């Protein structure tokens, strides 16, 4: 496959994002939303989809993460967690695996248009200048690629809105949560208690 990514590869992207956090200089195409690994690269590394998995795909995905360097504990933890510090390396390892199997990645390559004739895809246009012949194109734009959605609308391609959740972070002392759920503020055998508020 050919993977076109509007942002940078993980190492360069990390520098670009740190420059934004430190100096306030935003790169509109490579930031916390766009770049290798997507928005999840700068998340806390929790891997929970809350989706029923009757076909076992989730287990396969977690196994791939372990092959790429994630801790093996994620295979049996109720709430698997990678940690932000490991995500960049894991994402890079996965890219190298795909490249070794013949896949190609192009960074700083935004799909700016589609060439459609007789309701069939003929090519994708990259950065408004390069035409790449294609009959199949899988778009994975995330939430922030409004220009991509506008381009799809221009071509009368049907789209359906996905439900969108916005969360807030609420912090409670761990001893309080342990007391409420375990009946004691600390328990070495059980570890830290977790909970979810909805």
Outline where the language-model segments fall.
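Residues forming the flavin
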Residues: 1-46, 50-198
